[in-house]
Structure formats: structure tokens, C-alpha cells
Amino acid sequence: MATAKELSASSNVDNTVVGPSILISGRLTGDEDLTVRGRVEGELTLSRTLIVEPSGVVKANVAVKNAIVSGVVVGNINATESVELTREGRMVGDIRAPRVIIVDGASFRGRVDMGDVEPGRLPAERPAVVRPTAVTRPTATPARPTIPAARPMPPPPPSRPTPPPPPARPSAPPAVTRPSAPITRPGLGGLGSKPLPPPPPTRVERAEPQAGQAGSAEPPTPVLVGAGAKKKVVVKKKTR
């Protein structure tokens, strides 16, 4: 396949150029190379190569042998050999070609169809890349933080001292009993008062012995009389 430089060098012989100030609208066909520096709209069919310069704009469905896009293409490109998008190329559409080159920096939005694989030209199997096994490093288990000791409970607030009970009021002194005044008898004149005589002693009566006990030899029980009392004896005569 011819590169872009080779196509541009050979295009000096049979090459048609659409200048920057030219606008072609409609259907365009030809059997030679076409370089677009202006604007082409419609449908483009060539048996040779289409070259879109950085200043060129093509808004058409293109059917060519080779296509080199350095400008802007809006439409589908169907090439029998190759399609190349350079670094300055911008394309929106689908590409159908057996070989497609998209250089780093190009902008493309669409689908690419490179056809069926020819028999006898199966893609060579890529050698298996041996990737180094990742070395597993022992993961150090982080030590668990020690649980801080429980904070000591604050001491209870001091209890307020119980106020002492109020002092007991002193009880009133007992009333002093004054001795009663001596009773003076009326009619005694200037004589001094005399104390009253003591009350008479209690009269004690001796129980009489029963008839069956008259002849007993026990002497009668003497009667005790308090000191200062007069002794009074009562004698009863037995009636026969």
C-alpha cells in the first residue's frame, strides 16, 4: 500500500486540486487523484486516491481506492485498499476497508468494518506473555489498641454533717409546796395557836373464839397498838 508521502509525490502527474475558495456540491466522479483544500458536498466516487488537506471539508459518502484524511470528513468512507486518519484528521462516520490506520491524535466517531479474514492468512498467534507472579508479602496484622483502663469513679461528695439537735429547754422547777398556815381557833384571844391532836388509832376488834374452841389452851393473840396511842381493852362477857 502506498503511503501518504508516496501518494502526494505521485499525485503531481494526475491530480486534481479543489482550492480553498472552491465549493463543489453534487455528485463528483473521476479516474485520478483528488486533493480537497476547499469544500465538497454530496457524493464522491473515485478510482484512485482522495486526499483531504487540513483546510479541506468533505460532507459526502465517499467510494475510493485509498483515502488520506487530514481535514474534516462527515460521511461514510468505503475504500478498496486503505483508509488513514492522520494526527490532524477529524471524521464522523463509518469506515469500511481491509486496512484502517488511525494515528494517535486523530478524532474518530463511528464504526469500522474491515471485512472477512481471507483463508490462508490467519492471524499469527501472539506468544503468551509470561507475567511475573506477584509476590505476596505477609501482611502484618496491626496490633489492636489496648483498651484503656476504666476511669476511676469520682469519690462521692462529702455528706453534709447533720446539725445537732437544739438543746432541750430546761424544765420548770417543781413548785415548792408551802406549809399550810396553822389554823387558829377563834375565841382563844392572845393565846398562841396549838397543834391539833393526832387522830385516834384504828380500833382493832379481836375476833371471838368459836364455841368449839373455848376450851383450847392457846392464849389470846396480843393486840399491837401503835406508839403514842392509848390502849383500850374491850371485855365482853359470855352469856351462858
From Swiss-Prot:
Subcellular location: Cytoplasm, Cytoskeleton
Domain of life: Bacteria
Species lineage: Bacteria, Pseudomonadati, Myxococcota, Myxococcia, Myxococcales
Pfam families (alphabetical): Bactofilin
Extent of Pro residues compositional bias: 151-173
Oligomer and partners: Interacts with BacN and probably also BacO, the 3 proteins colocalize as an extended structure. Interacts with PadC.
Functional description taken from the UniProt entry: A non-essential component of the chromosome segregation machinery. Positions the ParA-ParB-parS chromosome segregation machinery within the cell; BacP seems to be the most important bactofilin in this process. Forms a heteropolymeric, subpolar scaffold in the cell; BacP probably forms the core, BacO contributes to position and integrity while BacN does not seem to contribute to assembly.
Deletion phenotype: BacO forms single filaments from one pole, mislocalization of ParA and of ParB-parS complexes, nucleoids are more compact. PadC is found throughout the cell. In a triple bacN-bacO-bacP deletion ParA, ParB-parS and PadC are also mislocalized, nucleoids are more compact, DNA origin regions are mislocalized, DNA content increases. The triple bacNOP deletion is synthetically lethal with smc or double scpAB deletions.
One GO BP annotation of this record: chromosome segregation
Keywords, alphabetical: Chromosome partition, Cytoplasm, Cytoskeleton
Organism of origin: Myxococcus xanthus (strain DK1622)
InterPro entries named in the record: BacA/B
Region (Interacts with PadC): 116-240
Keyword Cytoplasm attached: yes
GO cellular component, one term: cytoplasm
Biased composition annotated in UniProt, kind: Low complexity: 126-150
Name of the protein: Bactofilin BacP
Assigned protein family: Belongs to the bactofilin family.
Region (Disordered): 117-240
Gene: bacP
Residue spans of biased composition, Basic residues class: 229-240
